[in-house]
């Protein structure tokens, strides 16, 4: 069964989808326009809040795609992950991308296991 928990009609996408034992979470950003460290932290807060809608926490995340405007900002990621994940780290991939708005420096998409 597929359950769309949060739908963005303007962008025509679902930011949280439950599909079987997995939850797919997209477009996690926070603190737009602030320094990248604050945006990374804010993105994890957004991810955590969205996972709560599915009854999950960050410890259920098994995979993350971490998108940066500047890949050199990857140097901030590990310490912020350690702050949020308490040793239960997901696999992750980091890459650069262009964002639609100038103030966005970081975004997360994630997959969580619900089983």
Which ranges hold each PLM region?
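N-terminal presequence-like segments and the immediate start of the first folded domain
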Residues: 1-62, 68-115
